[in-house]
């Protein structure tokens, strides 16, 4: 573990040494610690951390009285739905792939009709203005990027249907609306400062300008780190709860479609749980950006990559870690670097033991080689969770760039 200190706070980063922390990641962490909104909170960065868009991935922070919407970002409520299925059920992997593609929209596409689980999501209560009917048609669709459907198997022969997805376009709208609110809040303060300066100048009280500005306790912040507080913060958390619920039911809808199509019955189901890794834990007042909750005895999944599968773990409730853990292996290469440097031949070879029709140029940025090795994560997570099983993928599907 290393510690990084900034102007307003410090953060523990759960890597062995600075050599395992990329420079861009270090700079993002330091930038956050130099912002006023970080003051007084407990910030912990997970071992799978890497530089992200606007915020370091693997970030956790306890909420005091301020939140930056761009920290969680647009993929609100992104997580993984896991259904453990008895080894007595027979899977035909070729048919599973066919059934998935026939029933689950991927990439930019969405459903033609609304799924019945839309009744569990009340978009009418959103403060964020949206096209309700358009958003509801996205419930039950996978999306693109690193979102996937997967079938894994454990050492006992039992199966795990894993679905990784988020709140789709709804998350974009919610994040954009509230970050713009935060920027407007900041700009209003700038205007207020300017008016104070102008008034004091008119009155010949230039010497009092700095003392008056100091009373406001307001500092300049970049737009992407503008924060909400007070009633606006309450409004943001209200919308976050709805968007996170949307993401949950969207994954459940995809699971429902596959179970119906394959005739998976209750008697076949051994367990079911959900692990979210991009959200605000409203009950416990913790932000997790690329991090999962690991409260005591909580069962969770930590995916590694398309070839090596996932860890099934049980939380230890480590409060020094914000009761959190890594949400995956963490990227070793950015998407652009992966697309430029990785070869299709190596990608295909790494996936030889997994049935998939998704190994193509459009998904090469999700190649196993683009992620950190599993061993690096296993070395550091012992204080936050117990590894129960390592499950191996036998089928995987992802949207490619053209979908």
Predicted regions and their residues:
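Domain-length cofactor-binding catalytic modules of enzymes
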Residues: 2-32, 38-45, 51-59, 65-69, ...
């Amino acid at each position: 573990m290393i510690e990084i200190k900034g102007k307003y706070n410090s953060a523990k980063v759960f890597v062995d040494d600075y050599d395992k922390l990329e420079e861009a990641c270090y700079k993002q962490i330091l930038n956050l610690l130099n912002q006023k909104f970080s003051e007084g909170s407990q910030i912990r960065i997970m071992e799978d951390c890497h530089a992200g868009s606007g915020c370091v991935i693997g970030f956790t922070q306890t909420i005091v009285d301020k939140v930056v919407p761009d920290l969680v970002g647009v993929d609100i409520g992104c997580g993984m739905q896991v259904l453990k299925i008895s080894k007595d059920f027979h899977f035909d992997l070729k048919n599973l792939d066919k059934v998935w593609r026939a029933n689950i929209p991927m990439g930019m596409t969405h459903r033609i009709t609304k799924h019945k689980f839309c009744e569990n999501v009340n978009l009418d209560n959103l403060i964020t203005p949206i096209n309700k009917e358009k958003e509801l048609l996205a419930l039950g669709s996978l999306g693109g990027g690193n979102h996937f459907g997967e079938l894994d198997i454990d050492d006992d022969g039992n199966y795990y249907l894993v679905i990784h997805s988020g709140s789709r376009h709804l998350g974009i709208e919610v994040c954009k609306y509230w970050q713009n609110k935060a920027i407007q809040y900041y700009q209003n303060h700038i205007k207020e400062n300017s008016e104070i300066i102008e008034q004091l100048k008119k009155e010949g009280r230039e010497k009092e300008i700095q003392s008056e500005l100091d009373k406001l306790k307001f500092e300049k912040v970049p737009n992407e780190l503008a924060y909400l507080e007070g009633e606006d913060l309450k409004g943001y958390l209200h919308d976050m709860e709805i968007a996170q619920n949307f993401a949950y039911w969207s994954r459940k809808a995809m699971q429902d479609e596959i179970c119906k199509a394959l005739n998976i019955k209750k008697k076949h189901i051994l367990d079911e749980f959900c692990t979210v890794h991009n959200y605000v834990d409203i009950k416990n007042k913790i932000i997790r950006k690329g991090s999962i909750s690991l409260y005591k005895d909580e069962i969770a999944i930590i995916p590694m990559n398309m070839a090596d599968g996932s860890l099934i773990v049980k939380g230890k409730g480590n409060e020094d870690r914000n009761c959190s853990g890594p949400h995956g292996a963490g990227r070793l290469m950015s998407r652009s670097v992966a697309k430029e440097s990785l070869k299709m031949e190596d990608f295909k070879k790494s996936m030889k033991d997994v049935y998939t029709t998704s190994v193509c140029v459009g998904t090469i940025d999700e190649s196993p080689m683009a992620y950190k090795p599993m061993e690096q994560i296993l070395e550091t997570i012992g204080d936050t969770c117990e590894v129960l099983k390592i499950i191996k993928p036998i089928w995987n599907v992802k949207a490619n760039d053209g979908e």
